[in-house]
Regions:
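Electropositive, beta-rich accessory/interaction domains or terminal extensions
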Residues: 1-128, 134-135, 168-230
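Short loop/turn positions at the edges of beta-strands in beta-sheet-rich folds
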Residues: 95-97, 143, 153
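Loop/turn positions that initiate beta-strands
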Residues: 104, 154, 158-161
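Active-site glycine-rich loop that binds ribose-phosphate moieties when present
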Residues: 130-137, 141-151
């Protein structure tokens, strides 16, 4: 895809709500709705975009970006995706897939500048929303997770704005696709984890997970239960 065609397709936010799955009621803010017009982006993301858990959001996870190119795949395997934001993302993009961006890269959108911090680690709430228990694992194995960014320069952006991609300064440039593989799939790749830890701009949540993993010599006591819906 040419750089000229990369753009922001939609901006979405969500509030806390309850979704039902079998006999369970699950509180979540995973249901996002597209916003119209120009949207102000602060250091913590979109005002009014709620999070149920304290460890969701924060400077390293201010916004979730999801490439719209993945929607056709998910529809082909049976997911009913309608509006942008269906995969719980804040920014739905055309272009800049997980293979295109690396930890520490910058993206200029309108007057906003964000920096790529870490791959997304999907959880069971996506499974509950779509009634598909395997969905979080499928997202990890396909690599179609999206990625989380920190806000470097707050400002205003809107759907249709161009995405201007700038490489970061990391000596070892690790794509989100590779970072996601190391974090979410190949959990015994200690060498890969050490490489990822060498990138200063890596988000602190992932850094904490990988530091413990390396110290243990492999996956140890990690929260893989987040993937599974009872």
């Amino acid at each position: 895809m040419s750089t000229a065609s990369r753009h922001l397709l939609a901006i979405s936010s969500g509030q806390k709500s309850v979704i039902n799955h079998g006999s369970r009621s699950i509180e979540t803010a995973i249901v996002k709705q597209p916003l119209a017009g120009a949207v102000t982006i602060s250091p913590l993301g979109i005002e009014g975009d709620e999070h149920v858990y304290e460890h969701h959001g924060g400077p390293d996870m201010a916004l979730l970006i999801y490439p719209s190119e993945h929607y056709s795949y998910w529809r082909s395997v049976g997911l009913q995706l309608h509006d942008a934001g269906a995969m719980a993302e804040n920014f739905t993009t055309v272009g800049l897939l997980e293979t295109d961006v690396a930890i520490g890269d910058f993206i200029n959108i309108g007057s906003v500048v964000v920096q790529v911090a870490q791959p997304r680690s999907p959880c069971f709430k996506l499974a509950a929303r779509f009634g598909r228990k395997s969905l979080p694992v499928e997202m990890q194995t396909t690599g179609y997770t999206g990625y989380l960014v920190r806000v470097i320069e707050p400002g205003v952006c809107e759907a249709g704005d161009a995405l201007l991609h700038e490489s970061g300064t990391a000596v070892d440039r690790i794509s989100i696709a590779d970072a996601g593989r190391i974090l979410n799939v190949d959990r015994h790749d200690i060498e890969g984890a050490q490489r990822l830890l060498s990138v200063t701009e890596l988000g602190e949540t992932v850094r904490s997970t990988l530091t413990a993993r390396v110290a243990a010599g492999g996956q140890h006591g990690e929260d893989v239960d987040r993937l599974y819906l009872d």
